[in-house]
Amino acid sequence: MNKIILLLMFCGLPALAGCTSEKAKAAFTLDTAPLTTKNVDAVKGQRATCAGPAVKTFNLEAIETNVNLGMGISFAAWTYNGRIPAPIIEACEGDKVVINMTNKGTTAHGFDTHAMKIDARHYSPVAPGKTMTIEKVVDTPGVFMYHCASGPVTDLHIKSGIHGAMIVYPHKGQLRPAREIVVVEDAVYGVRDDEGFIPGTDPQLAQKNEQAFSMFNGRMDNDAVRVNPGDLVRMYFVNVGPGVSSAHVIGTLFDRVYDGKEPIVGVQTYAVPAGSGVLLEFYIPEEGVYPFVDHDKLAFLPYGLSLAFATGNISAMAH
């Protein structure tokens, strides 16, 4: 892709949207190719999503299946559509979002999104073989978690892998050109056998928030995300838990953090509570490796809880 060096002039913004100012300038490379990891697809982005139909329908299936976590470890998980994390849901502010959730499992499952303002009774459990439909206009831009809703055992379902990220883009104001990626932090609560298989979530470990592994995007072995010096990376980040995630990129700062209407500028580490999402933007300042980590869980390095952004053919293990 051709790269054009631009001067971007920026100032305080409405929710998630960009504007310009002569007081602050930053050079960046206009490369907007989306970024991905093994378990997460590329986002469509604000422009394509908001140009689409005003009614957006998403079909989810609750599936109980074994998933590969990498590094020789597999897990008997509960999922949406057979994957951890679940498919990305993208909508535009003002869209009506329709969710059809079919339970193909052997126990009750459900659906709950933090992006909707709706009577909680709509999030009741769904029996095996049944389908629920939830529809609502989403009116608040942001990054949100969605997950299974199964009454008193909802926590166990979430910790078994049935969760995902939902993005609601602002209808007015364009986001800055950037390389976009979704990152979900989650954990596994179970004991693996001699062959590396974890036969489901251990309720006692889950109750105590004692995770065996913490991961980004459901993998212990994410490859380095390839970027270029000068790239602006926009990360739609969701923290499933447990506890607060201390989001940090080793080697650079967050240029902007969006966790409400106005951006926070020049942030070294940002606390994201369990069950919450945030938009994080950072530049790749020069050739090198820039690991994204949870600074509160460095004990889980290098097993899953590091996602390296690296330029060229530089080894992601350099740090």
Q: Which sequence ranges carry the predicted segments?
A:
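Copper-binding active sites and cupredoxin-like electron-transfer domains
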Residues: 19-319
